[in-house]
A protein has these predicted regions:
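Cytoplasmic helix-loop-helix junction between adjacent transmembrane helices
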Residues: 168-207
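Paired small-residue
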Residues: 148-155, 163-171, 375-380
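Helix-loop-helix hairpin linking two adjacent transmembrane segments in secondary transporters
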Residues: 160, 164, 201-249
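Structural signature of the two symmetry-related core transmembrane helices
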Residues: 140-155, 235, 345-361
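Juxtamembrane intracellular "pre-TM" segments in multi-pass secondary transporters
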Residues: 61-68, 252-283
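Conserved MFS/SLC helix-loop-helix module at the cytosolic interface between two early adjacent transmembrane helices
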Residues: 124-163
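Helix-breaking motifs and short loop linkers at transmembrane-helix boundaries and internal kinks
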Residues: 103-105, 137, 158-164, 175, ...
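Helix-to-loop junctions at the C-terminal end of transmembrane segments
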Residues: 126-137, 329-344
Length: 472
């Protein structure tokens, strides 16, 4: 697989000016006239034509570059918004959980199912929407998903019972999954090689801000209205994103590249992807890295506040700093590392840092270094979270580079596996109660070591490095 190559849209989807079906064909001189004119005349004419073509090409290239920059910015903003919508839907709602419990007169455990339902919907929805986008293109399934998201979110704002709220949170997650899976597929349609890895790092910057600001937005909304107002705001965000997608996100999958089969064909495509050892290796590696992240999200409120006695404000500050570290390293990955080093080498380095940070956290929680305070634990979590900015975008890029004609299905498998593996691992951090951080560290070490094992055992990066060095 090539590790460079720029935008696939420039090579495949955008016809060169003057060569498309609507371009005028320049007149061709008869052979008799050319022979009569002599070699010198032909040479002079060729030189003049070449100069004219060069000048025209330069002007066309400049215009194309400006258009590409404007288009690239719009695509970045649209796809960034789509990938940020699911974390907004999850995290804006968190400050309202106690209020929902009181308002609907339901047990806390029942209201917590509204989070589980939304998360499950996001995981399963990707399996449905991904193959749909490979068959009907990216725009139609995305617009349909956005419309359903808006309707489901609006009904959540009006839900009179906990059961109805749970049901439409599930539908909200199913529909919101369209943004996640199709955003990745669009990136695969438009970019290849290191350009794709860079774009994923940019998306991580945008989507990484969402979990930081979402609880703050939810808390501010609660100052002026009740919990239903949060869903009203999310409905407005959904309407705005739907209009933006309809206006500015054009179709990126041409009809000739689409799959024509039904469910059977989609399942066959996914089975073929899973049969690809290297793709499956990157998929599981990314899922296990995501599980390390989920373990942190699930356990850190209790570890930081209950065990080490930090205030909620201190926890929010540390959570924000860790998110900033992830975003910053993601930008370093996209701007500096990708293109200068092989993606597998960068990914391997990131996974190694995650393993070392997780081991350090485990040793500290076991008391190997004596009694440690919050600062060393916070430092270990910061290093671990920052390294995610290298691991996560590069596993996605490497996996999708192997799927030229099934990016939707591949994106669905990547997203679903990450959510499912994370959902399985995250409850394990509370298996020993809220009084110890050891389960969190154990889950992180096991998942991190398993991620390295999958990367080495299934992806086998040294084999591709040897083939690339040999020019194969």
């Amino acid at each position: 697989m090539p590790e460079s190559g720029g935008s696939r849209a420039q090579r495949e989807h955008i016809p060169n000016p003057g060569t498309g079906p609507g371009a005028e064909t320049p007149p061709t001189l008869p052979a008799q006239v050319i022979r009569a004119a002599g070699a010198d005349t032909v040479s002079g004419a060729a030189g003049a034509v070449g100069a004219a073509e060069a000048a025209g090409a330069a002007g066309t290239t400049a215009k194309a570059t400006q258009t590409a920059r404007r288009t690239g910015f719009l695509v970045t903003m649209v796809l960034g918004g789509l990938t940020a919508l699911p974390p907004l839907s999850m995290d804006m709602y968190l400050p309202a959980l106690p209020a929902v419990t009181d308002s609907l007169s339901a047990p806390a455990a029942t209201i917590q199912l509204t989070l589980t339902a939304c998360l499950a919907g996001m995981a399963l929805g990707q399996l449905v929407v991904g193959p749909m986008s490979d068959r009907w293109g990216r725009r139609k399934p995305l617009l349909l998903g956005m419309v359903v998201y808006v309707v489901a979110t609006a009904i959540c704002a009006l839900a009179p019972t906990a059961e109805l709220l749970i049901g439409f949170r599930l539908l909200q997650g199913l529909a919101g999954a369209a943004g996640i899976v199709i955003a990745r597929a669009v990136v695969r349609d438009l970019y290849d090689g290191v350009e794709m890895a860079r774009f994923f790092s940019t998306l991580m910057l945008i989507s990484g801000v969402a979990p930081i600001i979402a609880p703050l937005i939810g808390g501010q909304v609660m100052r002026f209205t009740d919990w239903r107002g949060i869903f009203v705001v999310l409905t407005g965000v959904g309407v705005l994103l739907t209009l933006v997608v309809w206006k500015w996100l054009h179709e990126t999958l041409p009809p000739g590249s689409r799959h024509t089969g039904g469910v059977t064909d989609a399942l066959r495509t996914m089975r073929g992807l899973l049969a690809d050892r290297v793709f499956t290796g990157y998929m599981i590696t990314g899922g296990l890295a995501f599980a390390v992240l989920f373990a942190y999200i699930s356990a850190s409120p209790f570890v930081v506040q209950e065990i080490y006695g930090a205030s909620p404000q201190t926890f929010s500050l540390l959570f924000g700093l860790n998110s900033i570290g992830l975003i910053a390293v993601g930008q370093i990955n996209g701007k500096l590392l990708v293109g200068r080093f092989r993606l597998d080498k960068v990914l391997g380095f990131g996974l190694a840092v995650i393993v070392l940070a997780a081991l350090a956290l485990l040793l500290m929680t076991l008391g190997v270094f004596g009694e440690v305070g919050l600062v060393p634990i916070a430092a270990g979590l910061f290093v671990l979270m920052s390294a995610m900015g290298v691991a996560m975008p590069n596993t996605n890029a490497q996996a999708l580079m192997r799927t030229k004609h099934a990016a939707g299905s591949a994106s669905a498998l990547l997203g679903t596996s990450s959510f499912l593996i994370g959902a399985i691992a995250s409850p394990l951090v509370g298996i020993a109660g809220e009084d110890t951080a050891i389960p969190m560290a154990v889950v992180q070490v096991v998942c991190a070591v398993a991620a390295v094992g999958c990367f080495l055992g299934l992806c086998r990066p040294w084999q591709r490095a040897g083939r690339e060095a040999a020019g194969l």
